[in-house]
């Protein structure tokens, strides 16, 4: 009797396990489960669940630090070599001598390049939201240089305070000496570094898709899962967005280097798909990154620079301000702050340290500064939410694995 009872219990457990495994193998069940899990993760944000979000964020940070510590330990010889190199550079940096002028020059250029590369990476990677650093930093910088160049008739701004502050040089430039190419050359370094940063930011989708294809293991990345689903239903795609994505995928897959170059050179929101496509179809790294770097850091950046420089050239700006005044009823009142802002900028360009009281701040510049602060603050919040949701995904995957083994 006892043996029969034991056999019945084993059969009951086995049947339950088979039924459970069958549920997990059902595509509709898995799809519904993924949808529920995704909705649950998306609800973990600071303004809905602040305590859980902060807790998950801290745990995800600790896990990330642990993973990086393990990776660095496995590459300890390289870490030691880098530390020795930094020690030698520190000695060279702090020892007095005639070489200090070159050290200061290299330090200034390296920090300047690193700043713009970092902003480019932030703009490209985004971590869930994207910090549009071209609109917030590079675009206004190019616009300021353009306005200053036409006002000063020169781009030889005193260093310092340039690039932190732009003032006209002591010697007056010749009227009409400024050309489009002069301004392009002045801002070429920072623009190319920003473009290189955006190219570097496109690498994570490429490496993720490539690793998933080579390993044959189903990835947990939602964008890659959507890409595979799009390929499966390519023949039945009806909506414009899906057809546009398929067009980008076909261009990159069939044309190769030139197709990637074309996608990277033209501002478009679908280039992330190009990185996933290249990784999925095992496009060589240097083919993908080389085309992306040339397209974003050279071709696309020159297009964007030309647009900003032409838009903020002296006669265009004056025409735009005059056109604002033509707007019925609100035109004159709306035109006044723009005129005051431009006049304040002209005075600031000719302002010297010993020229009296500082200039009063215009409300347009004040509003733009507050907009930048709000955007950066929102970006930080999005990072916290994104990392908290990443930890929630770990918890869901762990729970799913336990359920599969029952």
Swiss-Prot record:
It is found in: Endoplasmic reticulum-Golgi intermediate compartment membrane; Cell membrane; Vacuole membrane; Endoplasmic reticulum membrane. Residues 71-76, 132-250, 295-306, 385-406 are extracellular. One of its GO terms (cellular component) is endoplasmic reticulum membrane. Residues 1-35 are annotated as: Disordered. Its main location: endoplasmic reticulum. It comes from the Eukaryota. The keyword Transmembrane helix applies. The keyword Endoplasmic reticulum applies. Residues 173-316 are annotated as: VTT domain. Disulfide bonds: none annotated. GO terms for biological process: lipoprotein transport. Belongs to the VMP1 family. This is Vacuole membrane protein 1. It comes from Xenopus tropicalis (Western clawed frog).
């Amino acid at each position: 009797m006892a043996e029969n009872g034991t056999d019945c219990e084993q059969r009951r457990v086995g049947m339950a396990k088979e039924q459970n495994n069958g549920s997990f193998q059902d595509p509709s069940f898995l799809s519904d489960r993924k949808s529920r899990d995704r909705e649950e993760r998306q609800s973990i944000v600071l303004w809905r669940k602040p305590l859980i979000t902060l807790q998950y964020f801290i745990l995800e940070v600790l896990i990330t630090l642990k993973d990086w510590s393990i990776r660095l330990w496995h590459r300890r010889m390289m870490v030691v070599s880098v530390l020795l190199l930094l020690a030698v550079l520190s000695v060279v940096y702090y020892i007095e001598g005639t070489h200090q002028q070159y050290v200061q020059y290299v330090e200034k250029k390296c920090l300047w390049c690193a700043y713009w590369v970092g902003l480019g990476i932030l703009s490209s990677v985004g971590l869930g939201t994207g910090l549009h650093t071209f609109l917030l930093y590079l675009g206004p910088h190019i616009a300021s240089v353009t306005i200053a160049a036409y006002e000063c008739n020169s781009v030889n701004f005193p260093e310092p305070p340039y690039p932190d502050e732009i003032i006209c040089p002591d010697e007056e430039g010749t009227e009409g000496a400024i050309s489009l190419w002069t301004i392009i050359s002045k801002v070429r370094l920072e623009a190319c570094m920003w473009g290189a940063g955006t190219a570097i930011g496109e690498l994570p989708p490429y490496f993720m898709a490539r690793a998933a294809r080579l390993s044959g293991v189903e990835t947990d990345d939602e964008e890659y899962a959507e890409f595979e689903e799009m390929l499966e239903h390519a023949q039945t795609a009806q909506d414009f967005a899906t057809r546009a994505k398929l067009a980008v995928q076909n261009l990159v897959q069939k044309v190769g280097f030139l197709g990637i170059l074309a996608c990277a050179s033209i501002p478009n929101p679908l280039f992330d798909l190009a990185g996933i496509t290249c990784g999925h179809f095992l496009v060589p790294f240097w083919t993908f990154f080389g085309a992306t770097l040339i397209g974003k850091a050279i071709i696309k950046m020159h297009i964007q620079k030309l647009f900003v420089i032409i838009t903020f050239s002296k006669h265009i700006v004056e025409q735009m301000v005059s056109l604002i005044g033509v707007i019925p009823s609100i035109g004159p009142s709306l035109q006044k702050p723009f005129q005051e802002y431009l006049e304040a900028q002209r005075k600031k360009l000719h302002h010297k340290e010993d020229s009296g009281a500082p200039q009063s701040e215009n409300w347009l510049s004040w509003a733009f500064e507050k907009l930048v602060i709000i955007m950066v603050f929102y970006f930080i919040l999005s990072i916290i939410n994104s990392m908290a949701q990443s930890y929630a995904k770990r918890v869901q995957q762990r729970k799913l694995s336990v359920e599969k083994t029952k």
